[in-house]
Amino acid sequence: MPMSLRLHNNLTRRVEPFAPLDPSSPTLYVCGPTVYNYAHIGNARGPVVFDVLAALLRRRYGALRYARNITDVDDKINAAAQAQGVPISTITDRFAAIYRQDMAALGVVPPDIEPEATAHIPQIVAMIEQLIATGHAYAAEGHVLFSVSSFEDYGKLSRRDPDEMLAGARVDVAPYKRDPGDFVLWKPSSDDLPGWPSPWGRGRPGWHIECSAMAAAHLGPTIDIHAGGVDLQFPHHENEIAQSECAHGGATFARFWLHNGMLNFSGAKMSKSLGNIETVHELIARHPPEALRYALLSAHYRQPLDWSDGLIEQAKNTLDRLYGTLRDLAALEAESGSDLAVSMTIPAEVESALDDDLNTPLALSVMASIASDARALRSDLMQSGQASARMIELHAARAKLLGAGMALGLLQQDPAAWFSRGTDAGDDARITALVEERSAAKKAKDFARADAIRKQLAEEGIVLEDTPQGVRWKRA
């Protein structure tokens, strides 16, 4: 039997046994993307890691209510739409769809609930009204602000002193604020920006209140696990706690807080602001998506991960060995006349590794050991000629390796499909997807991206032809 699930709770800074409030329906909320551009590979670490957690919770409890939001109203979105001269929905619809496609390519199972901020304006307004009514927020010059001093536990997650928090939040010290640390719940909108009617005039919500309202609407006032990147711990998650607990009479907002570490690239944190990012979309065009998933799981989720081409290549080579093992085991079974259906069971050693605060590096190591044992068994059976006599043992070895992969979202394709990557059939689908993306980029007036795709295809010897039926491509 696997041990009980233990998770590092960033609220207490301790690894603690996890038990949901309602064992029949644990709840998980993960902060999702702001859809104004392509997600970079650092943005994918959380979805991949917490996909492993979601699968573990479903196995353990038989059910899960998992929400991951879409932020589709934000100043960055407004800026992107204005820069490209297109409606805001053109930006958000496009990049939300690309995000979903990219996550699917990485093997990330969609959440049960994917709330969008713009679909929850009534809930956001109602929460703000409750905060004003209880003295935790105030209206000023068309804005509504949360009064940080009204919540004595402010800072309990990040454990920063007030001066540190003020610096970290990068808040505007506007004249209408009662305290420099007060943050925006609602802001006025000019006619050229998205806005909704409210008791405080036409406006739009602040970022932090969106997650609080969406989490409460779908998961209730108290959720079991709230997860996201460590860069969101302050101010975003700190502010979520303040808003939510004040709006719900002091009820604990989230019982466990999980934060994944950042990706580093050439020794520096990967971020859009530093310009050192690699997008998921570009990477999955050049590499097997499963190798990217493996690489993202290769370090413990709370630790930084050094991202490099070498890491991806190492992941590819490891998957080559693992899929090669599965292929060879299946071939030996077939040669010996086996018609047993594979019944995957996740090995206890893998479950125990994941129960230890999602120790994916240990789980990957266990999977490698299982594969090594399976190869040794195959060699022994081939040399001794006992494959037929020990068919159940051989079959169990393959099922065990597949089960280990299933727990991590790996090894779920046919080995032949894995080894056919880069062939004309696989490449044709990739090129067609790039051509379609280029057409969508041109329609959205994202000419920089369209030109970049054309250049990439030209370097690969792909010629594009405009026809009345649309764009066609051929190899030069």
Curated annotation (Swiss-Prot):
It is found in: Cytoplasm. It holds the Pfam family DALR_2. InterPro entries: Cys-tRNA-ligase (IPR015803), Cys-tRNA-synt_Ia_DALR (IPR015273), Cys-tRNA/MSH_ligase (IPR024909), CysS_C (IPR056411), Rossmann-like_a/b/a_fold (IPR014729), tRNA-synt_1_cat_dom (IPR032678), tRNAsynth_Ia_anticodon-bd (IPR009080). Keywords: Aminoacyl-tRNA synthetase, ATP-binding, Cytoplasm, Ligase, Metal-binding, Nucleotide-binding, Protein biosynthesis, Zinc. It comes from the Bacteria. Zn(2+) binds at residues 31, 211, 236, 240. Binds 1 zinc ion per subunit. ATP binds at residue 272. It catalyses: tRNA(Cys) + L-cysteine + ATP = L-cysteinyl-tRNA(Cys) + AMP + diphosphate. Gene3D superfamilies: Cysteine-tRNA ligase, C-terminal anti-codon recognition domain (1.20.120.1910), HUPs (3.40.50.620). GO terms for molecular function: ATP binding; cysteine-tRNA ligase activity; zinc ion binding. The gene is cysS. SUPFAM superfamilies: Anticodon-binding domain of a subclass of class I aminoacyl-tRNA synthetases (SSF47323), Nucleotidylyl transferase (SSF52374). This is Cysteine--tRNA ligase. CDD domains: CysRS_core. It comes from Xanthomonas euvesicatoria pv. vesicatoria (strain 85-10). Its EC number is 6.1.1.16. One of its GO terms (cellular component) is cytosol. A motif ('KMSKS' region) lies at residues 269-273. Belongs to the class-I aminoacyl-tRNA synthetase family. Its cofactor is Zn(2+). A motif ('HIGH' region) lies at residues 33-43. GO terms for biological process: cysteinyl-tRNA aminoacylation. PANTHER family: CYSTEINE--TRNA LIGASE, CYTOPLASMIC (PTHR10890:SF3), CYSTEINYL-TRNA SYNTHETASE (PTHR10890). The keyword Transport does not apply. Monomer.
